[in-house]
Amino acid sequence: MEAGDKFQQPSRRVNELWQTDFTYFKIIGWGWYYLSTVLDDYSRFIVAWRLCTTMSASDVSDTLDDALAFTELNQVKVRHRPRLLSDNGPCYISGELADYLEENGMSHTRGRPYHPQTQGKIERWHRSMKNQVLLNHYYLPSELEEQLHRFVSYYNHDRYHESIDNLTPADVYYGRGEAILSQRERIKRNTIALRRKNHYDRQRTHNLMS
């Protein structure tokens, strides 16, 4: 399936649509390394990632294996497995990946060539991650991997996203969003009520002293 100018099948719940893509890093003395990521479209939560030495179909399927294991979707029978959204890179159009997706009951949507906006969420993830991770120099793949671990944890659990009501991806992914937003609204109402009371109290005191 190919996506049009604008992705017409937005997700309505977690684990309905997963975006996946590669981005690359160069480690002096080691060469190029490639980060394979699976991002939940609804929550922006990074479900799985791998630092790879190639961009092969097996790297993609290994990352998807990690994602299915993390969500335990490989252990339960569900009506619909996550739909995969990718670009048209060689690894994503390969027969090997098509066979893997069929075996795992997953459908696949590919963006229109030269139209990265279709995968805007994972592209923004790449930018946010590289803005932080590339501030340092890495001399070993393990150093880069350690920094990626830290940033993924921060991104999932501590970084607020304006596009999801200033919640973290983990808040949305684990279903805490509604409760957090309700709590914020209660705090806001109580704060406004307290400010009004303080204002009226000051005004009354001023009038009594006049």
Q: What are the functions of these language-model segments?
A:
Residues D21, V38, R44, L64, ...:
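Mobile genetic element proteins and their domesticated derivatives, centered on retroelements
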Residues D40-D41, L51-S58:
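A short acidic/small-residue loop/turn micro-motif
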Residues E2, P10, H80, G95, ...:
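C-terminal domain-tail junction helix/linker
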Residues L64, V76-S94, R112-Y114, D165-A170:
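Acidic/histidine-rich, metal-coordinating catalytic segments
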Residues L35, S56, V60, L85, ...:
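Hydrophobic (often cysteine-bearing) scaffold residues that line and stabilize catalytic clefts
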Residues F45-W49, H108-G111, L135:
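Short small-residue beta-strand/loop micro-motif enriched in glycine and branched aliphatics
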Residues Y92-T118, I122-H126:
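Helix-centered, glycine/charged polyanion-binding patches within enzymatic domains
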Residues M1-L39, F45, D62-D66, F70-L73, ...:
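Mobile-element integrase/transposase regions
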